[in-house]
Design a protein with these regions (language model features):
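Histidine-acidic metal/acid-base catalytic patches
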Residues: 1-2, 8-29, 73, 98-100, ...
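Active-site acidic/histidine proton-transfer and metal-coordination neighborhood
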Residues: 15-17, 56-57, 74-193
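N-terminal substrate-binding region of glycoside hydrolase catalytic domains
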Residues: 22, 26-44, 66-69
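Glycine-rich, proline-tolerant flexible connector loops at the mouths of alpha/beta enzymes
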Residues: 32-52, 107-114
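Conserved radical SAM core fold
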Residues: 35-38, 69-72, 109-111, 226-232
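Metal-dependent catalytic neighborhoods of phosphoester/phosphodiester hydrolases
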Residues: 42-48, 77-82, 271-273
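Catalytic-core regions built around general acid/base machinery
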Residues: 47-58, 146-156, 211-214, 246-250
């Protein structure tokens, strides 16, 4: 979200490399990288050595790779098959970067939005949506497509030695913890789990310590941001109303050992806010002996 907030969706290769330099200058050594469509994936893949060399030179690593292909949930079987092939290419790129996890989204169903469609052109928060359900839309059919695609992606990820995770997001097919648990149950794989995104789940009025308890060992990765519990803004931790100590006590109890990604964006003085977020998490970790 850092590079996207500063340089667009998706950022160009030049801006991506600049973002890596800036993130490492701020003291971060574990990085998440996204591929937001087939063209962006090709650009990253064609310049994989350049990206890897830059990370290595700065003592950084790409721990999570996030390919975003909306056609994974298309009603058109040919489009879905193409998206699956692109996902496999993405897993190969994740292997090149020595990533530990590969992540995607569950996307927005084919509804009719009168105005802005969530996450289509940009990542924006606090929007009011106007939605119409098309006469031919059937949730059961869409859910079956989603589950099938997630199963296929999981098999590919597993074959490449990668854990596969999905992020519940406001405005998408899986938008809360219980929907995520339903998807985990449907996919039926020990290799498949969740990204606990604090900003999105808090905006869904969830009790985050309970969310962590529900997901338990199925939490593979964490996105850290804060908000007021009404809008899904992604502010630095401490600027909203999340019970951070309560959440981290549960994460400690369930034995979470993965990465915490500072996932703030679309805020003034982003670099300063990133550094403050990092310090907040470090102090909390020291306090709770994480």
């Amino acid at each position: 979200l850092y590079a996207i907030s500063k340089y667009g969706y998706p950022p160009s290769l030049k801006k991506t490399l600049k973002g890596v330099r800036e993130m490492t200058d701020l003291g971060f050594r574990a990085i998440e990288l996204e591929a937001i469509n087939s063209q962006n994936l090709r650009e990253l893949s064609n310049n994989r050595e350049k990206i890897r060399e830059l990370c290595d030179s700065r003592g950084a690593s790409i721990v999570n790779f996030c390919p975003i292909f909306r056609d994974l949930v298309s009603y058109d079987k040919r489009k879905r098959s193409k998206a699956i092939r692109l996902f496999e290419e993405a897993t190969e790129l994740a292997n090149f970067f020595d990533s530990e996890t590969i992540q995607t989204d569950t996307f927005t169903p084919p509804l009719r939005f009168e105005g802005e469609t969530p996450y289509k052109e940009a990542i924006s928060f606090g929007r009011q949506l106007s939605v119409r359900i098309p006469p031919d839309f059937r949730w059961q059919k869409f859910w079956a497509i989603l589950v099938d695609s997630m199963r296929r992606c999981d098999r590919i990820a597993q074959q490449h030695g990668l854990k596969f995770c999905v992020e519940p997001r406001v405005g998408e097919s899986v938008s809360n913890t219980d929907a995520m648990l339903r998807l985990i149950e449907a996919v039926e794989s020990s290799n498949f789990g969740a990204v606990l995104d604090t900003g999105h789940l808090h905006a869904q009025k969830e009790i985050l310590p309970l969310s962590a308890e529900k997901l338990g060992k199925k939490i593979f990765y964490i996105h850290v941001s804060d908000n007021d519990g009404r809008d899904n803004f992604h502010l630095r931790p401490g600027k909203g109303t999340i019970d951070w100590e309560g959440l981290f006590r549960v994460l400690k109890r369930i034995g979470f050992q993965g990465y915490y990604a500072v996932d703030i964006g679309n805020v003034p003085s982003l670099d300063d806010e990133m550094v403050k977020s990092k310090r907040f998490l470090e102090r909390l970790g020291e306090k709770l002996k994480l």
